[in-house]
């Protein structure tokens, strides 16, 4: 195949780029230097890995989770995104002026004909359960088309390949791809090591393809964790071969179940894209659905009126002082934990929104006295965390175990905070590592109105039927959140990063993409690049919007149904101030 289509015309190249043209998401830091020279890329580009030629045929998936195989598959995807899933950036330049921004399309222009990839860490083996992975990378593209990418880790290589792919656009003439801003020098590294999204698969079931597409979106935004809240009181979509009754009676349907092969496939798919997938089975609350198969293990299942016993129907919690519950959980964890442990560091044990009133249904307790229940909860948590550790995994929990129940946790346990209002500082001040998911900023399901219905005798009290956590978390609000705000240095060091949350009461396959993207990308830049720039100033929405508009277009071109954040008029305005609200 020809390297480029030779065109019989010349176009004058405008060295001054338009708003989103040449912008990257998330913005590289600490170094992103670029020029104004256009460079093409050859379709028959050669790629080397540590000096050896690297095969990169189309649609390549890694044969094994090795550094070389993962890199080869990453190259395959990056080139596919450049040559087959790219876009002509007419919407990023002033109306009908694309010809002024595209380079001259002729045979004499410089082109990237080889990409040299170097893994500098010295260890070419790949450990998906490794902690403190160095995800930094270096990328350079010269005016002559010389391209080099290096990193100490495989994940860093994948991030660099994503940046490489974002630099190129499709030419309006077709068959030609180019970047606008060589020479390019990038030194890039994340501010936070934990950058993720939590997906609830219990309120609505998401097919494997939806989850894999979400993983694609995470990788395009340099997010590296997918936290799957896999079960809840509403449904149990997880097949446990040794306890088949759980999904047989607890799933919405037998087509709404993740098999062991599905779980393995999802985790491997994620790791091949730099995304660790880890799972959570919330307990001892949020577990009512177990009562469908094992009613003697659960109290207050679907108790009414529900708001006395849980946050939403159906209620249900494990008995806190029952040997049968411990036997059941031993069998459950013996089945699931060894299967996920080779691919992940974490396992979530939940712990949120436990309602003491549930234990009034327990004939062995018949109390809601927290002084009685707290020691039992402590023992329950200790037992589950021992099982998690014995499988080689690190437990994660929700914040209420610390902030409301005063449970003593091991120093390894990671606490996920969601209630805001100084909770991160409180948790960190007690020495716990923290993942921030402040609902005021990072709950992407909020602002969609009530899913509850109200009878004629009471409906007027609840107009206009707002949900509990509105308003909608716009991309600007997501972008404004700093996980370390208000923390002292010691506390800030304990913040591992954050996760945006996608609770699925009103989200399913049909609106997942549009509600997640590109808003999750706004959090991705905060977590990768930092809320503030090198000068200590908050990153500006005004200068971020053109780049996020361009990123949204990339996502759409790559098969993700991302929502627009502005009208096209804003994108095509000659500078970023066209849709900026006047200061005074």
Summary of predicted features, one role per range:
Residues 295, 307-310, 314-413, 418-428:
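Active-site neighborhood of glycoside hydrolase catalytic domains
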Residues 14-193, 395-404, 409, 550-553, ...:
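Acidic, contiguous N-terminal accessory segments
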Residues 395, 400-403, 407-413, 417-584:
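Flexible, acidic glycine-rich loops studded with aromatic residues
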Residues 1-18:
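Fungal secretory targeting signals
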Residues 55-56, 205-207, 233-237, 284-290, ...:
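Flexible loop/turn segments at secondary-structure boundaries
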Residues 39-41, 45-49, 196-198, 227-229, ...:
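Structural recognition of the beta-strand scaffold that forms the well-ordered cores
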Residues 126, 130-315, 321-348, 499-503:
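Feature activates predominantly on carbohydrate-active enzymes
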């Amino acid at each position: 195949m020809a390297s480029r289509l030779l065109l019989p015309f010349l176009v004058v190249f405008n060295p001054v780029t338009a708003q989103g043209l040449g912008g990257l998401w998330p913005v590289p830091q600490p170094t992103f230097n670029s020029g104004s020279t256009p460079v093409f890329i050859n379709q028959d580009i050669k790629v080397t890995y540590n000096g050896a030629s690297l095969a990169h045929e189309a649609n390549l998936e890694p044969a094994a989770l090795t550094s070389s195989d993962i890199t080869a598959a990453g190259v395959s995807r990056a080139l596919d995104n450049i040559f087959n899933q790219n876009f002509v950036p007419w919407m990023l330049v002033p109306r009908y002026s694309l010809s002024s921004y595209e380079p001259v399309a002729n045979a004499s222009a410089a082109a990237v004909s080889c990409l040299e990839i170097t893994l500098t860490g010295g260890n070419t083996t790949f450990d998906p359960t490794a902690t403190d992975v160095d995800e930094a990378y270096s990328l350079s593209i010269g005016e002559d088309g010389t391209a080099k990418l290096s990193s100490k880790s495989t994940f860093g290589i994948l991030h660099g390949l994503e940046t490489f792919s974002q630099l190129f656009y499709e030419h309006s003439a077709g068959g030609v791809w180019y970047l606008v801003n060589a020479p390019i020098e990038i030194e890039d590294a994340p501010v936070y090591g934990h950058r993720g999204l939590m997906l609830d698969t219990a309120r609505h079931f998401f097919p494997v393809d939806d989850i894999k597409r979400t993983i694609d979106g995470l990788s395009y935004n340099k997010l590296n964790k997918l936290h799957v809240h896999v079960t809840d009181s509403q449904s149990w979509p997880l097949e446990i071969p040794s306890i088949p009754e759980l999904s047989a009676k607890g799933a919405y349907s037998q087509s709404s179940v993740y098999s062991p092969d599905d779980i393995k496939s999802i985790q491997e798919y994620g790791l091949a894209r730099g995304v660790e997938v880890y799972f959570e089975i919330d307990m001892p609350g949020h577990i009512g659905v177990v009562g469908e198969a094992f009613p003697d293990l659960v109290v207050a299942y679907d108790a009414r009126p529900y708001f006395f016993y849980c946050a939403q129907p159906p209620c249900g919690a494990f008995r806190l002082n029952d040997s049968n519950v411990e036997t059941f959980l031993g069998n459950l964890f013996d089945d699931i934990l060894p299967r996920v442990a080779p691919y992940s560091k974490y396992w979530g044990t939940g712990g949120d929104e436990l309602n003491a009133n549930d234990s009034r249904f327990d004939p062995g307790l018949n109390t809601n006295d927290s002084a009685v229940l707290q020691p039992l909860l402590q023992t329950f948590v200790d037992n589950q965390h021992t099982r998690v550790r014995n499988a080689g995994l690190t437990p994660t929990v929700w914040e209420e175990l610390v902030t409301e129940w005063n449970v003593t946790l091991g120093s390894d346990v990671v606490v996920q905070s969601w209630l805001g209002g100084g909770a991160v500082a409180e948790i960190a001040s007690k020495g716990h590592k923290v993942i921030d998911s402040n609902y005021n900023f990072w709950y992407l399901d909020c602002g969609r109105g009530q899913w509850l219905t109200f009878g004629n005798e009471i409906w007027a009290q609840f107009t206009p039927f707002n949900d509990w956590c509105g308003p909608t978390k716009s991309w600007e609000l997501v972008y404004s959140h700093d996980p370390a705000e208000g923390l002292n240095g010691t506390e800030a060091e304990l913040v591992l990063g954050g996760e945006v949350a996608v609770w699925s009461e009103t989200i399913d396959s049909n609106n997942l993409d549009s509600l997640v993207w590109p808003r999750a990308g706004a959090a991705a830049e905060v977590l990768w690049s930092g809320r503030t720039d090198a000068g200590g100033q908050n990153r500006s929405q005004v200068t971020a919007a053109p780049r996020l508009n361009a990123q949204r277009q990339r996502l759409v071109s790559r098969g993700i149904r991302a929502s627009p954040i502005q009208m096209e008029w804003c994108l095509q305005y000659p500078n970023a101030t066209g849709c900026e609200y006047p200061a005074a």
